[in-house]
Amino acid sequence: MQLFTASDGTQFKDRNEWRKYEFETNYTFRNKAQETLIKGPGSICGQPFDVSDLKDCVVMLLDHTDQVQVDHVAATKMFLGPSSTSVFIRNCSDCVFTIACKQLRFRDCNNCTVYLYSFTAPIIETSSDMRFAPFNGIYRQLSKQFEEARLDPHCNLWSQVYDFNDPNKSGHNWRLLRQEEEDSDIWKLFLQQALSEEDCMSEEIVPRKCTPNGNVALDGMQSFTFDTTQEEAQQTLWNGNEPLPIFPSAFNSV
């Protein structure tokens, strides 16, 4: 009989049970309060990751990932390293996020600040009091992780927020942070605790001004459902009157 051995030595006869155990052991943070939860560089290596049911925690995923799902999190600071696909965040309140991803979607969230790199326009649904600012993450391995996630740090649509629940495009559910409101040092102490002094040393790789044509669109909102695919969203843009985002030609096939 074939046995499946998990990374901690636990053995399973059933392959599905082994896979579930491995994911929940190594790629999940769940049911924690007042804890610091860290995955360092090289510990995720492009795998999906789940975060759920946290309160008053600090979470740092300092590696490139596949899809990340975040559910039912309150009063927490969360750093999500480069995701090659999507980050889905639901039912979160009073949180601060630093996120790098290809696609970002919020649903049923309230009073959150988001320091963002997103290769596509971020989407919010049934969410309120959301604040957005440019990505503020800096550490030595970050540039390599952007490459591994196939993300161009110079193409950042952090400000192009689409609000599904604002048909009149009033912008009452979200706003852009003024630069003087940003906390540029929010991760400095946590990174110093999680990484070596050498690994903390780095230059900024995501420029502040890297939206299409250097313009920040404050009123260019569109409406999409939480399940709208990126292809459907892009087709809506092509059929509408709003200016289209300009993507680097090297990424047209992504």
Annotate each PLM feature:
Residues 100, 111-122, 128, 133, ...:
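Ankyrin-repeat TPLH-centered helix-turn motif and closely related helix/turn capping elements
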Residues 45-46, 56-57, 64-68, 75, ...:
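Extracellular beta-strand scaffolds
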Residues 1-81, 128-254:
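Charge-rich, low-hydrophobicity low-complexity segments
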Residues 90-91, 109-111, 120, 127-130, ...:
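Short C-terminal domain-edge/linker segments immediately following a structured domain
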